[in-house]
Regions:
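Glycine-rich phosphate-binding/catalytic subdomain of phosphoryl-transfer
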Residues: 52-227
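Gly/Thr-rich phosphate-binding beta-strand-loop-beta motif of the actin/hexokinase/Hsp70
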Residues: 1-20, 62-66, 71-75
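Residue-level structural signal for beta-strand termini and adjacent loop
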Residues: 13, 25-26, 87
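N-terminal phosphate-binding loop and adjacent alpha-helix
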Residues: 21-59, 105
Length: 227
């Protein structure tokens, strides 16, 4: 299932990767108080609408969630959304992106999650002290389905720089970012999701995850890392 910018799309493929059936749901971002955003309730409803269009859901062998990269979804320790979803469409992090690019000596675009996080810090936004998790749209949906707070390495590369040798967050850049957040009650290492490579175990659909999609998928369904 792909949560794209204009449509949520679901495609079932067979063992030879040929498409068998599909479903879709149209949605669009809204401009609210200077922020391009989507309502996460719409993401859930759209996902359910897509799944309801697929006939052989019980016969699925595995599933995966994809979505628009980048952006900023910040949650507290109980996974309550702290501020509306800030999508990749926003260009509101110029100061943070420039400063991080200089600090890391590595290009950090405005749309990256870490640029959004640091801009919120620079802005003195009240929610920053409550942050326990930041993630992307596909990883949020994956967490709601499986209870696993993970991100695929491709998706991760739009959150924070990746070390291609380890397939994980860049250690030297994590250390540099820590120097900027010493006054925060959290550490960036704890706030970011766990990075997985393609093919690694990313969890299975839980009972609560199945309920989250109105029972449209069977409990125990294995999931690929979200990308």
């Amino acid at each position: 299932v792909e949560l794209g910018s204009t449509r949520i799309k679901g495609v079932v493929i067979d063992e030879s990767f040929a498409p068998v059936e599909s479903g879709d749901f149209e949605w669009e971002s809204t401009y609210d108080h200077g922020i391009w955003t989507y309502d996460l309730a719409d993401a859930r409803e759209g996902l359910c609408q897509v799944l309801s269009q697929l006939k052989d859901r019980e016969g699925l062998a595995a599933a995966g969630i994809s979505g628009m990269m980048h952006g900023y979804l910040a949650f507290d320790k109980d996974w309550n959304l702290l501020v509306p979803f800030r999508t990749w469409q926003n260009t509101i992090t110029a100061d943070a992106a420039e400063q991080l690019t200089q600090l890391f000596q590595f290009n950090v675009p405005q749309r990256w999650s870490i640029a959004h996080l640091y801009q919120a810090i620079l802005n003195g936004e009240a929610h920053v002290s409550q942050i326990a998790h930041i993630t992307t749209l596909s990883s949020y949906v994956h967490y709601m389905l499986t209870g696993e707070n993970v991100v695929g390495v491709g998706e991760a590369s739009g959150m924070f720089p990746i070390d291609s040798a380890t397939g994980n967050w860049n250690e030297e850049m994590l250390k540099k970012f820590e120097t900027l957040t010493q006054d925060q009650p959290w550490n960036i290492r704890d706030v970011l999701p766990r990075v997985l490579l393609a093919g690694q175990d990313a969890g299975r659909l839980t009972a609560s995850g199945s309920a989250w999609v109105k029972g449209l998928l069977p409990e125990g369904l294995p999931f690929a890392p979200p990308e």
